[in-house]
């Protein structure tokens, strides 16, 4: 694929993720939008790593670390959301002020 196509796709995914993160009122939807943002960043890392120096794998290795962090977030995030739901009976972001009680 050409560089411009990958960058446009990555910018589109990043924009959708930011828009969803800003407008989301549900914690699960916010976590999904955060995953979109991380995937867009990974696409940029791999693309620019291949563009600037295809012999070194620094961008690829860094994107693997980002994928590992995203996997940990995908495992821990729903557990935190289900715990909040059990205590508050809601997954809405504006209703879950945990510093209140």
From Swiss-Prot:
It comes from the Eukaryota. It is found in: Plastid, Chloroplast thylakoid membrane. GO terms for biological process: ATP synthesis coupled electron transport; photosynthesis, light reaction. Its EC number is 7.1.1.-. It holds the Pfam family Oxidored_q2. Keywords: Chloroplast, Membrane, NAD, NADP, Plastid, Plastoquinone, Quinone, Thylakoid, Translocase, Transmembrane, Transmembrane helix, Transport. Its main location: plastid. The chain crosses the membrane at residues 2-22, 32-52, 61-81. It is a multi-pass membrane protein. It is an enzyme of class 7 (translocase). It catalyses: a plastoquinone + NADH + (n+1) H(+)(in) = a plastoquinol + NAD(+) + n H(+)(out); a plastoquinone + NADPH + (n+1) H(+)(in) = a plastoquinol + NADP(+) + n H(+)(out). GO terms for cellular component: chloroplast thylakoid membrane; NADH dehydrogenase complex. One of its GO terms (molecular function) is oxidoreductase activity, acting on NAD(P)H, quinone or similar compound as acceptor. The keyword NAD applies. InterPro entries: NADH_UbQ_OxRdtase_chain4L/K, NUOK/Mnh_C1-like. NDH is composed of at least 16 different subunits, 5 of which are encoded in the nucleus. Belongs to the complex I subunit 4L family. NDH shuttles electrons from NAD(P)H:plastoquinone, via FMN and iron-sulfur (Fe-S) centers, to quinones in the photosynthetic chain and possibly in a chloroplast respiratory chain. The immediate electron acceptor for the enzyme in this species is believed to be plastoquinone. Couples the redox reaction to proton translocation, and thus conserves the redox energy in a proton gradient. This is NAD(P)H-quinone oxidoreductase subunit 4L, chloroplastic. It comes from Nuphar advena (Common spatterdock).
């Amino acid at each position: 694929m050409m560089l411009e196509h990958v960058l446009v796709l990555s910018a589109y995914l990043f924009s959708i993720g930011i828009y969803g993160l800003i407008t989301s009122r549900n914690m699960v939807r916010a976590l999904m939008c955060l995953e979109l943002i991380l995937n867009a960043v990974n696409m940029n890392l791999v693309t620019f790593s291949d563009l600037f120096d295809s012999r070194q794998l620094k961008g690829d290795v860094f994107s693997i670390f980002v994928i590992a962090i995203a996997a940990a977030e995908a495992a821990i995030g729903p557990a935190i959301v289900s715990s909040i739901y059990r205590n508050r009976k809601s997954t809405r972001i504006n209703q879950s002020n945990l510093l209140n009680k």
